[in-house]
Amino acid sequence: MRRLDGARKSGGAGLAGAGAAPHDVYTLPAGLPVPEDDGGADHLVGLELPSLVLESSLGDVNVRDFDVIYIYPQSGRPGVPLLPGWDETPGARGCTPQSCAFRDIHGELAALGVRVAGLSAQSLEDQLEFAERNAMPFPVVSDPERRLGEALRLPTFEIAGLTLYKRLTLVAEDARIVKVFYPVFPPDANAGDVLAWLRAR
């Protein structure tokens, strides 16, 4: 199994001076297992995004209204222990670095007319806290019943009694999926990869 060599760190609001603590949600530690393509997203290109209204950090949103939806397992909070086995689960770690990377290039995506949203199965309370702490300029969507996953048959995994989304990013054009990034690794590089793909079109 391939692993990430060398710790990677993404900036976060209010993180100035923080070190690579064991539960530093802004850091990707060295040695993370690299997820493999299990074919769980092979069917997605060509599908239409459903007309599905969900709660988000910026109010109710319809997933059809977005051009890029990055879907992630579960963001952490500083000082809160990770779920047992989180770092050993391929693709689990890195939700905050991924989100912060999308935040940091949001202006460039907006200049291309691209509307972005992040989405996980976490509660609205979790998404509101996360969005405020990290100054997210776009909606962070709450899908605790995994309704988008049911509509599109999105890949999931089980950990600590929870069913969570596997990390993937959907790019849509007129609400039809034209590109899927899956698996996504390292997570903090995904935003730049998406931007490069969009600019090359």
Segments predicted by a language model, with ranges:
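Chalcogenol-based redox active-site neighborhoods
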Residues: R2-R201
